[in-house]
Amino acid sequence: MEKVISIVGAGGKTTLVHKLAREYHRSGKGVLVTTTTHMYVEADTDLSCDFFALRDKIIKDGYCMAGHKISEQKISEQSKPKMCGLPYDLLDKLIKDMPQALDYVIIEADGAKHHSLKYPAADEPVIYPLTTDVIIVLGTWEKGKLCKD
């Protein structure tokens, strides 16, 4: 395991998550993408939360986007389905048990809910405890404007 990268902020987190994942994967690294909150489900996302299925996918493909399904009621309210992140105990096990196959875990951490900025609070951003690097994404479209609630 080289790094566990958590990406927080607004205006481009998902794009950055996928760009980093593609670049690391292209360079021959094993990559797992997940979230600590909610994230849109992409094609070929594994929602099984099954250690062996995730392990096999990472070993076979060198890449896996994984999480668990949000309840059907919440999914139906979205135009595109969203997922929650992997349970921390499962993520811990994948990191611990796959040191040769899993090089990078890239986590879309807490977001700003379509605002350009969100102040940190006691319980946010939601950052995975084994994170080695945090990247803060800030949209510049509101540069120069006052921050308010």
Segments from the language model and where they lie:
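Walker A (P-loop) phosphate-binding motif
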Residues: 1-27
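General beta-strand structural signal in soluble alpha/beta enzymes
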Residues: 7-8, 31-35, 65-68, 104-109, ...
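N-terminal phosphate/diphosphate-binding loop that engages ATP/GTP or pyrophosphate donors
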Residues: 21-73, 77, 81
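A short secondary-structure junction signal
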Residues: 116-121, 145-149
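Inter-motif core of Ras-like GTPase G domains
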Residues: 121-143
